[in-house]
Each structure stands twice: as structure tokens, then as C-alpha cells.
Amino acid sequence: MKKILTIILTCFLSLNLAGCSASKNNDDILAFFNALDNTLNLKSAQINGTLAMKDSKLNIDAQILQKDELQVSSSIGLVAGKNVQNNFLNFYIKDGKTYLNSMGTKTQSTVDKIGLKKNSKLNAYNPFLDLTDDQLCELFDSSKKENDTYTFKVNTSKLATLLDNMGSVKLDHATLVATIKNKKISHMILNFTGTQTVDDASADIDVSIELSIKKLYKINFPNDLDNYKNETAED
């Protein structure tokens, strides 16, 4: 009778532990990284995003069109405490020239000054491209899929190493939520918290990155680009 009870209790506990443990679907994880690679290889896209940290936030609007000649329009807004600067930095590429509007100071130059040619194309770097499927799956501790939305618990140790391989970053929690449509990412949120220690001084880390990505067919540039001041060697 004791043996029977022991078996029953063992089975019961095993079922409960299995129910409480985090589930992980490697196919869903690989689907995310495949979608990430497809997204990074897009020839055109409009990207709206925010980078929120403990005491500040960046608002980003980037438009990239490079089916023919490279065109770029990007805008960065900055929020620091109660200070808000919506047009902190605006940058454009058009007709082989670059245009910069930094808080009202407008200058123009040529793309060769930033290491590009007139017919250059931008290539996004995929830091996960050389990892095996097993290594990619190790980056997440759990996964959940509901329709087109994928939710992952990120391995904090591996993410900390990606952020800083010197070992100064220690993370307590990290999650990633992504919406995948047509094998491409349309929306993504990454949150992580922890601490960073440099020279015995520690600072809390509380970061949230949110991106929305959609198709782009045309960029509407400001109509005063020709009036931007030409950069000189002294500038």
C-alpha cells in the first residue's frame, strides 16, 4: 500500500512540477529569429520606436527606402525628466547628399563624408547570424505563442553578455514580445532590468525598447533641404 501511495504521490508531484515549469517551443524561437533576419533584410521600411531608460526616453522615427537610390529620413525626440525636445535631431539622405537638422542648426554634406557612395545600400547587421539553432534556442528560457504574438522569457545571463562581455551587467529579468506577420516582425517590445557595476559604482538598469515596423513606398522630405548650409572643413 505504501508503494502504491508513493507512486501516486510521485506522479502527482511530477505533473504539478511540469505544469509549473516554463514551457519552451524551439520552433517558435527559430521562427522569431528567421523573422528577425527577414526584417533586417527589408529594402524599405518605416520604423517607429521608443527607447525608455530610467530617467530618459528617445522617440525614433526612421524611414528607409533603397529600392533604387538610397533615401533616408530619421527623426529623434528626447525626453529627460520634464524637459522635452521633439526635434532633437533630424537626419536625411537624398540624391547622394546628407542633411542634418540639429535643434534648428541645418547643414548639408555628401554621403562620402559618412563612408557611403551615391549608389550605396544600407545593410543591417544581424548579430545572431553565426549562431547554431541550438545556440539560438538557448537565448530564451520559455516561449508562448498566441496567434501572431510570440512571448519569450530571455535568458538574463546570455543577454547580459550580449550587452557587455566585460561582465559589468547583471540582469534580473528580461522579456521579449514580438508580432510576426508574413514571416517578418511588425511589432516588438524588449524589457530588461538589472544593474551595471563599473569601478565599484553600481547603477540600476531599467530599459524598454519598442519598435513598430511597416512597409514604406515614399518618403516626404522637408521642402527646404536646398537651403541647408554647406559643411566646411572647419565645421
Which ranges hold each PLM region?
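Sec-dependent bacterial lipoprotein signal peptides
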Residues: M1-G19
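N-terminal leader/targeting segments and the immediate start of mature chains
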Residues: L15-E69, N220-D235
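Extended lipid/amphipathic-ligand handling interfaces
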Residues: F33-N38, I60-D68, L89-F91, D95-T98, ...
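Short, hydrophobic/aromatic-rich segments at coil-to-beta transitions
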Residues: N41-N48, K67-S73, E146-T151, I185-I189
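Hydrophobic lipid-interacting interfaces of membrane-associated proteins
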Residues: G49-S56, G77-G81, G96, M103-T105, ...
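An acidic-aromatic
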Residues: Q63-N126
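Flexible, processing/modification-adjacent segments and terminal tails
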Residues: S102-T161, S168
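Gly/Pro-enriched, hydrophobic low-complexity segments
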Residues: D148-D226
